[in-house]
Amino acid sequence: MESWIEVSLNTPAQLSLPLYLPDDETFASFWPGDNASLLAALQNVLRQEHSGYIYLWSREGAGRSHLLHAACAELSQRGDAVGYVPLDKRTWFVPEVLDGMEHLSLVCIDNIECVAGDELWEMAIFDLYNRILESGKTRLLITGDRPPRQLKLGLPDLASRLDWGQIYKLQPLSDEDKLQALQLRARLRGFELPEDVGRFLLKRLDREMRTLFITLDQLDHASITAQRKLTIPFVKEILTL
């Protein structure tokens, strides 16, 4: 079963943002595929003591949120203060939640495309970026569904700022890499996913990794409940395929 890590963030502006991050989305559970250089750059930024900025972009479901969750988990375990702002859930909070985040060790802004054209959010992110530059200590990670220059931002200065740092496209996994990622996730959860079962899932299901991981969790639970090993006939029975 999936569990979650709660991180409480209290900024100097006295705004509290509780973060609920899946505890299985770590660097150890991320299968890089063709993204080894991206992963190395990200981990290097987290190791350094001064500020650093990386922008990651990809289509939805490629793993960019996983990497931000992993970065938050790694620094949280070191005792550092982190902030994670999922802009696809921006109705949960207001732009002022960014006030004071330049004092944190790490700030992660996920799905920036969701606030394109929103003047208040764009200005809040722009101001935070400038404060982070001045502080010289905070690491900033931002994700989007396209390169910075292609975001439909209303604030040209923000588009320019986002284009300053290291920019990486998160490459999609091949089917072979997806199989490896599924088997890795299974091992971390304490069970084995036979290769033939993994290939069957890739053939019969949506190949989007989030869907595959959810299905893997479902099969794990069903296997434990029924006290049966994962086989293709059992998978067909559970998933009614």
Swiss-Prot record:
- GO BP: any one term: negative regulation of DNA-templated DNA replication initiation
Question: What InterPro entries does its record include?
Answer: Chromosome_initiator_DnaA-like, DnaA_dom, Hda, Hda_Enterobact, Hda_lid, P-loop_NTPase
* UniProt KW Hydrolase keyword: no
Q: What does the UniProt keyword field contain?
A: DNA replication, DNA replication inhibitor
Q: Does the keyword Coiled coil apply?
A: no
Entries under Pfam families matching the protein: Bac_DnaA, Hda_lid
NCBIfam families with a match to the protein in the record:
DnaA_homol_Hda, PRK08084.1
Role, per record:
Mediates the interaction of DNA replication initiator protein DnaA with DNA polymerase subunit beta sliding clamp (dnaN). Stimulates hydrolysis of ATP-DnaA to ADP-DnaA, rendering DnaA inactive for reinitiation, a process called regulatory inhibition of DnaA or RIDA.
Describe the family membership recorded for this protein in Swiss-Prot or TrEMBL.
Belongs to the DnaA family. HdA subfamily.
Subunit info?
The active form seems to be an ADP-bound monomer. Forms the RIDA complex (regulatory inactivation of DnaA) of ATP-DnaA, ADP-Hda and the DNA-loaded beta sliding clamp (dnaN).
The name this protein goes by in its record: DnaA regulatory inactivator Hda
Tell me which species this is from.
Citrobacter koseri (strain ATCC BAA-895 / CDC 4225-83 / SGSC4696)
